[in-house]
Amino acid sequence: MTIFNDKYMCMLELSGIYKSFFKQRILEDVSFTVASGEITGLLGPNGAGKTTIIRIINKIFTQDQGHVSFNGSLLTQKHIAQIGYLPEERGLYKSMTVEDQAVFLGRLRGMTKQDVKTALNYWLERFDIEDWRKKRIEELSKGMAQKVQFICTVLHDPELLILDEPFSGFDPINIELIRSELLKMKAAGKTIILSTHNMKSVEEICDRVVLIHKGRKVLEGNVKTLQNESKQGIYALTFKGNMIAFANALWVGYEIIDKEVHSDDLFTVYLKMRSENELNDLLNTVIPHVKIQKAAEVLPSMEEVFMQQINKEREEASHE
């Protein structure tokens, strides 16, 4: 069993996973770990192999090589009852009522009918949708059906929750609702994997990320650590004063790369350090000329971290 730190341990480990379909390599030597009690983002563009990885974890596909461990043991079919999986292709039986759908799926996960109804009561009340119980799925709006699908995924109280493109098609209200529930589940000790091509949608709630590109893992680590390792010396300064006076106060060690005009005398400017200067050097340069309201280093998004790594690999390959 892999120990991450004093608090968290490894729940899921993929080691040397290969998978091909019709002689086309889909996954190549994919290895990564998922820590217990954390939210891990499985990120990458469409077609990178993320869904294939998830289906291997759920025993829908079998890998050609490598192994998957769950809580220190080789993953077997018996572990699947401890996993909640929300696939990208949402699937509910439209003629069923919400309650019948929940009972059907809960029974597949080994729950008794009474346990399903008890859990369903809890989630319907939590989402303030108790009156949906006897509605048929076909009577629900898309957003309503999405809530039901999420409830059916977590009904059996899984140890590991895997959501494939979790916010795809959700309206902003439901996105915030699901995001809030995921954070509550994490606080309760659940382990969560969020798989998406939309890195911005999950980077704020992920503890760790695994970046997948063309069937290979290109990067893995703590979100803040990866962002700090990839930062480009860009700072955001919000100030009151004259924009021309601010620009004139700068010297060749700084480059203005963008700005936001909030009012006639309130601006946010994004600057890139051209040398080994630090934030204090920048502040000492401009404070005599404008009133600084906020100053902070800008960390790259996970999409920017991803592109930096891809460009680095391309450059290294071109020199081989």
Regions found by a protein language model. Give the residues of each.
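Conserved ABC ATPase "signature" region
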Residues: 103, 107, 114-132
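Catalytic Walker B motif of ABC-type/P-loop ATPase nucleotide-binding domains
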Residues: 161-165
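ABC transporter nucleotide-binding domain
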Residues: 180-272
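Conserved ABC transporter NBD signature motif
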Residues: 66-79
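Helix-to-loop junction immediately C-terminal to a conserved catalytic motif
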Residues: 58
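Conserved ABC ATPase signature
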Residues: 136-143
